[in-house]
Amino acid sequence: MIRTGNQYRESINDGRQVWIDGEKVKDICNHPSLKPIIDIRSRMYDMAHEDKYQEKLTYLDEETNELNTVYHKPPRTRDDWYEKDTAMDSLMHDIGGVVIRVSDETVGEMWSLFDGQDVLNEVDPQFARNIENHIIRATRDDPFHVSANTDPKGDRSRLPQDQDPDMLLHVVKETDAGIVVRGAKFETAAAYSNQAFVKPTIGGWAGNEKLSDYAVSFICDMGAPGLKHICRSGFSGRGSVEDYPLANNFDEVDTLLVFDNVLVPWENVLFYRHTSAAAFIRATLHRYSAYPFVTRIRYVADMMIGAALFNARQTGLDKHQAVREKLAMLACYREGINAHLTASIALAEKSPGGLLMPNQSLLLTGRVHACTRLPEMMHIARELCGGQICVTPNHAAFNDKESGHWLEKFYNVNENWVAEDRRKLLAFARDLLNSDYAGHRLTFQLFAQSPPFAHLNAVYNNFDFSGPLDFVRNAAGLSEKVMQQ
């Protein structure tokens, strides 16, 4: 089924405990830091019911004869991936910005665990059935699904058992109803989502230890008793929406999730204590989810290109060779991302679970390209936009009767670029490249799917080195013995 925006709002108005800026949130849907992004999320749901978008955003479930969201559909063909691209393009253009947490990028992590059914069956066949049931539920119930990965860390030179044991999420008790967990996780959008796929990120075990209370993964209801959401300060409302159009509409608030003896029903447990299952999910976690994650960065690249080119055109600088060179660098960055995404689906592979996974080497290489070059590309876009993004007065100054007169005079360029359009463009570019929100988003993109060194390690583990080795062996006339190492 597909839900409406109002149904989504009602589902998160469940009495969950949420704090922002030291105050407990009484009305989550109308809190100034959360309302804008909840409105965006509601819009995502409502779009699926509109004639203009329904065919692009949904598909017919042949078993239930109901419409389901394309975002959560397990991909089995290339067309499934192309349909996801179409749906995402419709969403981004409708809302006029970029959001990371749509659910497609986090549901994909469950597909990775689905591929590890043989590992789960060795642990407990019920866990394999649980993941299959939750994939079906995500497909048919249309929840806002997120992913809880990052721990508070603590002293990483010591095992969790040798410090405050709650620094890493762990099981403290088993009951007939399920497991009881303590600890904490950071998660984007948790405070206004329905459920999270919780999993370990750091091995809380040593050597060849096969069992650990820290090796646990489960689906958690974000309104569960004992769960506390402590949010970072929001960017919305710090300045006017006219001056900060992105920060005021697309701030996806991050949360420290505190698990204070939270009961997880057995049917929601995906694996427990077995380090082999934890190792598998860490190695394959982004097998599918890296695709929508990198796709989002492509849209960020489009915004940088558009903002930079408009800024160059308004003053006629787009005719200069040096300016075109930098614009071409932005275009190469964008097309490099797009090429990796396109090729990863064109050369997609069947997964162990029977799904169609993007070509891992190409996709993960594309992620490195997108993330590592993003700071450089933002700097180039900033150069192209020029210094006016840091010196232009705010919207109120343009509207003032006295100061507005002078701003109208000096910000009008010609009949095509009047003062108000220039002000809007400069405000957009400032929020995209220079604001607190822009800095936050840059750091988020660098670490959201693990740090840069882990991205490169994923490429190392998925690139086929046998071809280059064999090529050099033949070219250098080496014996077969060198291939046996």
Describe these PLM feature segments.
Residues 1-47:
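N-terminal-proximal low-complexity accessory segments that begin disordered
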Residues 46-145:
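Internal helix-loop-helix
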Residues 147, 152-296, 461-485:
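FAD-binding core of flavoproteins
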Residues 150, 313, 339-346, 375-382, ...:
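Charged/polar positions within long, soluble alpha-helices
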Residues 324-328, 356-365:
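Short, charged, amphipathic alpha-helical segments
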Residues 361-485:
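Alpha-helix capping/hinge segments and adjacent helical runs
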